[in-house]
Design a protein with these regions (language model features):
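C-terminal substrate-recognition/cap domain of FAD-linked oxidoreductases
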Residues: 53, 59, 63-64, 72-224
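FAD-binding subdomain of flavoenzyme oxidoreductases
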Residues: 1-89
Length: 224
């Protein structure tokens, strides 16, 4: 979203064209409104996107956590550390099953850094210190391989790569699955850190109960 500089939206009421400016402090950002609407307000016919220099340096890691909420605390620490990872996604135990990267007994953190300017050893080292301090386990050899060359492909393999592939394939599975009697969908939300644990538990319980009541079938709900 941060790379979008301007958009042109065709709506039933007319055309909305935003200005091509690197930034503006004049009220709400209309481009955010257009992007977030996901087609409900109109059809995006044009978009200007800031070109980015492809990263030359990459580092990636996946970590396992026996305690899901310890993993959540780890993600909070990473988010507030100033390290700014390019990818920081936490999969709860159920989500690891859907992604084919776990057996449902542990949570998994997918972590990555990218840069065109500098090697990433110091950033990854500090991130892994945070991971370890929260009880996470990772493959040090795999992390080292991910930083072994400027053209590393290690970040596309292993657990992190398997999750990425599953994430990209999921939209293509959704419609065929309906023909097999399986309905899959996602919804997004946000909550403050201090309320996350009770919120997570409540959503899982309430949504599972609602699906079972409506379909008579046991539902599977996961979080990432």
């Amino acid at each position: 979203d941060d790379f979008v500089e301007a958009t042109r939206l065709v709506t039933p009421a007319g055309v909305m064209q935003t200005r091509r400016l690197p930034g503006s402090g004049a009220g709400p950002a209309p481009d955010r409104l257009v992007i977030g609407s996901e087609g409900t307000l109109g059809i995006v016919t044009e978009a200007w996107v800031r070109v980015q220099v492809p990263p030359r340096f990459r580092a990636s890691a996946s970590a396992q956590f026996d305690d899901y909420f310890a993993a959540v605390a780890c993600v909070r620490a990473l988010a507030q550390s100033g390290l700014h990872p390019s990818n920081c996604r936490l999969l709860d135990p159920a989500e690891t099953i859907f992604a084919g990267v776990g057996d449902g007994r542990t949570a998994m953190l997918v972590l990555a850094f990218e840069s065109d300017d500098h090697p990433l050893q110091a950033w990854m080292d500090r991130a892994l210190e945070i991971v370890s301090s929260h009880g996470g386990r990772y493959d040090a050899a795999a992390v080292a391989r991910s930083m072994s060359s400027e053209d590393s492909v290690e970040h596309r393999t292993g657990a992190a790569g398997a999750w990425r592939d599953a994430f990209m394939r999921m939209p293509y599975w959704r419609d065929p699955a309906v023909g097999l009697g399986v309905i899959m969908d996602t919804f997004e939300t946000a909550i403050t850190w201090d309320r996350f644990e009770s919120f997570y538990q409540s959503v899982k319980e309430d949504v599972t109960r609602a699906i079972t009541r409506a379909t008579g079938q046991k539902a599977r709900l996961s979080c990432r």
